[in-house]
Curated annotation (Swiss-Prot):
Keywords: Ribonucleoprotein, Ribosomal protein, RNA-binding, rRNA-binding. One of its GO terms (biological process) is translation. GO terms for cellular component: cytoplasm; ribonucleoprotein complex; ribosome. This is Large ribosomal subunit protein bL21. Signal peptide: none annotated.
Amino acid sequence: MYAVIENGGKQYRVTVGDKLRLERMEMEPGAELALDRVLMVGVGDDVQVGRPLVEGAAVKATVLSQGRAKKVHIFKMRRRKHYRKQQGHRQYFTEVRITGIEA
C-alpha cells in the first residue's frame, strides 16, 4: 500500500516504514502526527485518486528528529565589474517515519 501526500508545497510517495524529511514542524521527537492532505492511495492495481484530496484518508507518522539541511551556497557575479556577492542558506526540516496509511 502506498500514498501520495502533500506537505510544504511538495508531494511525496510514501509507504509504511519510509523515512522522510518534511518542512519544519514544531514537534518533539517521538511525537505522533497525522498527515491528512492525501492526494492518492494505491493498493496494487487499485488506485484511488482524490479531487483534490482523498476523503477520510490519513497517513500516520512519528517524529524522529529536527535538523537543518546542508548549506546551499548562492554566488552572484557580474563579469568584468569586480562585483561578487555570496550568500548561504540552511533549511530547517523535521524527519519522520511513516507508521501507517488509513484509506
